[in-house]
Curated annotation (Swiss-Prot):
This is N(6)-adenosine-methyltransferase non-catalytic subunit METTL14. Residues 409-423, 441-450 have a biased composition (Gly residues). The lineage of its organism: Eukaryota, Metazoa, Chordata, Craniata, Vertebrata. The gene is METTL14. Heterodimer; heterodimerizes with METTL3 to form an antiparallel heterodimer that constitutes an active methyltransferase. Component of the WMM complex, a N6-methyltransferase complex composed of a catalytic subcomplex, named MAC, and of an associated subcomplex, named MACOM. The MAC subcomplex is composed of METTL3 and METTL14. The MACOM subcomplex is composed of WTAP, ZC3H13, CBLL1/HAKAI, VIRMA, and, in some cases of RBM15 (RBM15 or RBM15B). Residues 245-254, 297-298 are annotated as: Positively charged region required for RNA-binding. Residues 45-76, 393-456 are annotated as: Disordered.
């Protein structure tokens, strides 16, 4: 850790020296004096020249004033000369750079009655990240102001708890284990690989094997995925955003969503992470790519997915250094969204074992997985689905129904006059209800006469 910090300091010192050479500064410490703009330097020079000119002309004018008024007291003249000398000495003092100790000078809207919140500057002053001030981020209070959604979440949690299979887990080295032995094919697969990126950010040594994206791509996920299924892949916040998409395409998935985990530091403001050598800024978020396989439409496949129940953001406190566990909320998002009961968690740990999931990972301390027993939970027709109640179906968000031709109005072929089937432009002027030159019957919106009302 100390060697890493020393290396960062040496690199910073070298950058400052190179910058000083480019700017023509005498040393790295004098860079600040050269960063003033040309306009500022010109303004400072003009101000100094104006002050010197005023000092040079003020002494003769003062002497003439005393002579005109008959005041020739030498003491007063000496006092005035001393005052001028003091002012000139202050002017000749070297320029001192002003040091700002708080953000009051830079706050936005300070002249208004309602100053703006500058969360970026507040982070610089206090170390509190801007995401610390997002309200109602917890599962318990997120839907307090939305009673229908709160009731929907409660009903879905009860249904999921009733339909969950007993928790099963298998201790296995995923790199050497043939995952094709896992049966049956799964509706949901969650991958949480121990990436090298996680340990670069923490600056500690990994206590397990770090997986590269080449190793992850070799996994035969497509062999254990159902024809209609979803995958959730934690990919960090760096190169994994692109390489994770490559993995999804190789396994036959299409990326359809990006769930973002935003980390707060309310409990430990100002804590700085070890800077990733491959990053410019300190990253405070991670991404979980979501992929879809097969044809699933939210408007027609309500038996398999319930869309728009949760949001695609997870906002929780950042874990301690060295802890690479992901928030448990990802399980709630998956269970609320997909109604499939065959759920697989790869690279799981003892802390992630939960009902309704088959957990596989090298760090598990025990195993209870039995292929025949697990397959028996889904032997009945449609038993791989959790099902849905009438109340859940009524409360859940739905896509608007498609509009038919009759809903749009009309249904009869175009033609005739503007209002209906009478196509003449003045041929039947003697008929009742005739509309003159435009033709047709006056109607509403539908039917043969553009409104469906029979002619009177």
């Amino acid at each position: 850790m100390d060697s890493r910090l020393q290396e960062i300091r040496e690199r910073q010192k070298l950058r400052r020296q190179l910058l000083a050479q480019q700017l023509g500064a005498e040393s790295a410490d004098s860079i600040g004096a050269l960063l003033n703009s040309k306009d500022e330097q010109r303004e400072i020079a003009e101000t100094r020249e104006t002050c010197r000119a005023s000092y040079d002309t003020s002494a003769p004018n003062a002497k003439r004033k005393y002579q005109d008024e008959g005041e020739t007291d030498e003491d007063k003249m000496e006092e005035y000369k001393d005052e001028l000398e003091m002012q000139q000495e202050e002017e000749n003092l070297p320029y001192e750079e002003e040091i700002y100790k708080d953000s009051s000078t830079f706050l936005k809207g300070t002249q208004s009655l309602n100053p703006h919140n500058d969360y970026c500057q507040h982070f610089v002053d206090t170390g509190h990240r801007p995401q610390n001030f997002i309200r109602d981020v917890g599962l318990a209070d997120r839907f307090e102001e939305y009673p229908k959604l709160r009731e929907l979440i409660r009903l879905k949690d009860e249904l999921i708890a009733k339909s969950n299979t007993p928790p099963m887990y298998l201790q296995a080295d995923i790199e050497a284990f043939d995952i094709r032995e896992l049966t049956p094919k799964f509706d949901v697969i969650l991958l949480e690989p121990p990436l090298e990126e996680y340990y670069r950010e923490t600056g500690i040594t990994a206590n397990e094997k770090c997986w590269t994206w080449d190793d992850i791509m070799k996994l035969e996920i497509d062999e254990i995925a159902a024809p209609r299924s979803f995958i959730f892949l934690w990919c960090g916040s760096g190169e994994g955003l692109d390489l994770g998409r490559v993995c999804l395409r190789k396994w036959g998935y299409r990326r359809c969503e990006d769930i973002c985990w935003i980390k707060t530091n309310k409990n430990n403001p100002g804590k700085t992470k070890t800077l990733d050598p491959k990053a410019v800024f300190q990253r405070t978020k991670e991404h979980c790519l979501m992929g879809i396989k097969g044809t699933v439409k939210r408007s027609t496949d309500g038996d398999f997915i319930h869309a728009n129940v949760d949001i695609d953001l997870i906002i929780t406190e950042e874990p301690e250094i060295g802890n690479i566990e992901k928030p448990v909320e990802i399980f709630h998002i998956i269970e609320h969204f997909c109604l499939g009961r065959r759920r697989l968690h790869l690279f799981g740990r003892d802390s992630t074992i939960r009902p309704g999931w088959l957990t596989v990972g090298p760090t598990l301390t025990n195993s209870n997985y039995n292929a025949e027993t697990y397959a028996s939970y889904f032997s009945a027709p449609n038993s791989y689905l959790t099902g849905c109640t009438e109340e859940i179906e009524r409360l859940r968000p739905k896509s608007p129904p498609p509009k038919s031709k009759s809903d749009r109005g009309g249904g009869a072929p175009r033609g005739g006059g503007r209002g209906g089937t009478s196509a003449g432009r003045g041929r039947e002027r003697n008929r009742s209800n005739f509309r003159g030159e435009r033709g047709g019957f006056r109607g509403g919106r539908g039917g043969a006469h553009r409104g469906g009302f029979p002619p009177r």
